[in-house]
Each structure stands twice: as structure tokens, then as C-alpha cells.
């Protein structure tokens, strides 16, 4: 079975990318830009380092999400519940990835969270949009999602935080 249905993928693109992508455009400069050697005009925009990073991070998120989906099914949960948890995990991954994508060279832990107030508003807003959808009749039915337990929240948060070790 597929880990997510089409409408869930569309929703994921909205809540895991929509708010955060716009907010990242307001990320202040890091400083020291003038001391960095200019990139050659013949160098591709997506160099080896960026391609490698995208492959590693994307593979990690996909692998963890799929293994959690399969584990949920193996525990006797329904396909709908497994998809519900997979979607929440991917929303959490998107928020953590947005926070950690603020710099190419510095970790999330070395940059003040409040340097970009737009992102600090966008991340909780995206998460609240998804949580709100879980509790909204009609929308929760279309997305085939439902509220999750505290234990499930903790499990998904731990899995999503593993992304910080990979990035």
C-alpha cells in the first residue's frame, strides 16, 4: 500500500513548504559574504555538495517515514492510521528541515532562532494548520487524518529530530 494518498501529498506540499519557503526568503545575511571567493560563472548552481546534501536528507526522510509506516502496519494499525502518522511525520520533517536550512555552513544550533521572525511564525503556523485540519470536520475526512496520541507525538518528534543528526 502507498504511504500517502494524493490529497495528503498536496496538503503536505502546502503545510510543509508553503509558509516556510516564503519565510526563508527573509533570512538575514550571515555575514562574511564578501570574504568568500566568488563562484565561477561556469560552476553549476547545483554543485556536487548540494546534490549530495539533497540526496542524503531526502533519502533519510523517505527511509524513516517508510519504515515508520511499515512498522505501524506491522503493529496491527489500519492503513489510514499508518498514513495519518506518516503525514504528520513528514510535516514535522518539513518544519525541522526549514529551520536547519537557514545556513549552508552553520547548524540550527549556532544561529539564533529569532533572527528571522517570519520563519519563527511560519513554522508553528504550518504545524498548527495541520493540527487544526486533524480536528476540522470535513477537512479531516477529505485528508483522512485524525488526532494522534501523546505517545505517537513523542515517537514522531523523536523520529523527526533524527534529521538534525543527518544534516
Name each model-derived stretch.
Residues 1-167:
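C-terminal transmembrane helices and immediately adjacent loops/tails
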